[in-house]
């Protein structure tokens, strides 16, 4: 895993699968969405195989691994079931995330500092089969430093607090928190990605932070695609972040 010379867009297609699973149909197909996203300029495709299988299914992951032209960023919880599945399919990139059954979406970052031994064992286990691991964490120096200690080459900073901020003061504070996290992560020698809650009206400020390698965005893209089409939604987002990062 190397730092990109330009900002990258990772497209999360989980909510294409959410729409499919709502009726238990074969459509819309998240694999087709992934291929359309690649054609529109996505640099990678992110999928989260949750314990409850509420959206992405194992079959989706297997198909994506075979057909993607870019790369798959496989999000998973730190469980024996998911570690065994990862060992079976050997994705090139894995992001370890926290997961609880009741949450609507991932609500916070992984507590690496509070469970270093467990996370370190998972990172080492995945590294042995050639997987490059990132950790989805809050933009907190304690968590970033712990991520470095457990051997992860990359982190993804949770931007949810920034996305949920209500007042201009709160927005500025949370944006600065992310920027400080990026700077600290880079100083630790980590590759720093970011994502969660980003959309067309708040992404530019994050994309403009120097040193961010990749932004992972999903829900906003799928929502916008209902009105403009998936390729157009991805192309618009890619143009926004590239322009902001210049």
UniProtKB/Swiss-Prot annotation:
UniProt-listed Enzyme Commission number(s): 2.6.99.2
One GO molecular-function entry: pyridoxine 5'-phosphate synthase activity
Enzyme class (EC, first level): transferase
Subcellular location: Cytoplasm
Chief subcellular location: cytoplasm
UniProt keyword annotation of Magnesium present: no
Enzymatic reactions: 3-amino-2-oxopropyl phosphate + 1-deoxy-D-xylulose 5-phosphate = pyridoxine 5'-phosphate + phosphate + 2 H2O + H(+)
Binding site for 1-deoxy-D-xylulose 5-phosphate: 14-15, 50, 55, 105
Keywords for the protein's UniProt record, in alphabetical order: Cytoplasm, Pyridoxine biosynthesis, Transferase
Site (Transition state stabilizer): 156
Catalytic residues (positions): 48 (proton acceptor), 75 (proton acceptor), 196 (proton donor)
Listed GO CC annotations: cytosol
GO biological process: pyridoxine biosynthetic process
Functional pathway: Cofactor biosynthesis; pyridoxine 5'-phosphate biosynthesis; pyridoxine 5'-phosphate from D-erythrose 4-phosphate: step 5/5
Binding site for 3-amino-2-oxopropyl phosphate: 12, 23, 197, 218-219
Role noted for this protein: Catalyzes the complicated ring closure reaction between the two acyclic compounds 1-deoxy-D-xylulose-5-phosphate (DXP) and 3-amino-2-oxopropyl phosphate (1-amino-acetone-3-phosphate or AAP) to form pyridoxine 5'-phosphate (PNP) and inorganic phosphate.
Subunit structure: Homooctamer; tetramer of dimers.
NCBIfam families from the UniProt entry: pdxJ (TIGR00559), PRK05265.1-1 (NF003623), PRK05265.1-3 (NF003625), PRK05265.1-5 (NF003627)
Family: Belongs to the PNP synthase family.
Protein's recorded name: Pyridoxine 5'-phosphate synthase
Naturally occurring in which organism (per UniProt): Pseudomonas syringae pv. tomato (strain ATCC BAA-871 / DC3000)
């Amino acid at each position: 895993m190397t730092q990109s010379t330009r900002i990258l867009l990772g497209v999360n297609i989980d909510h294409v699968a959410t729409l499919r699973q709502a009726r238990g149909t074969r459509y819309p197909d998240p694999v087709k969405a992934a291929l359309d996203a690649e054609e529109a300029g996505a640099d990678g495709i992110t999928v989260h195989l949750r314990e409850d299988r509420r959206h992405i299914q194992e079959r989706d992951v297997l198909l994506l691994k075979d057909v993607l032209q870019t790369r798959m960023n496989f999000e998973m919880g730190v469980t024996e079931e998911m570690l065994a599945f990862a060992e079976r399919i050997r994705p090139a990139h894995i992001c370890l995330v926290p997961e609880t059954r009741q949450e609507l979406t991932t609500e916070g970052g992984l507590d690496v500092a509070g469970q270093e031994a467990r996370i370190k064992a998972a990172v080492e286990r995945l590294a042995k089969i050639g997987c490059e691991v990132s950790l989805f964490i809050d933009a907190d120096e304690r968590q970033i430093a712990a991520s470095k200690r457990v051997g992860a080459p990359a982190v993804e900073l949770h931007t949810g607090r920034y996305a949920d901020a209500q007042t201009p003061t709160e927005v500025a504070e949370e944006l600065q928190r992310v920027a400080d996290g990026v700077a600290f992560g880079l100083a630790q020698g980590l590759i720093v990605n970011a994502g969660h809650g980003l959309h067309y009206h708040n992404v530019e400020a994050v994309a403009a932070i120097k040193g961010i390698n990749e932004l992972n965005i999903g829900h906003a893209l799928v929502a916008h695609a209902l009105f403009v089409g998936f390729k157009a939604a991805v192309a618009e987002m890619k143009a926004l972040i590239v322009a902001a990062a210049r």
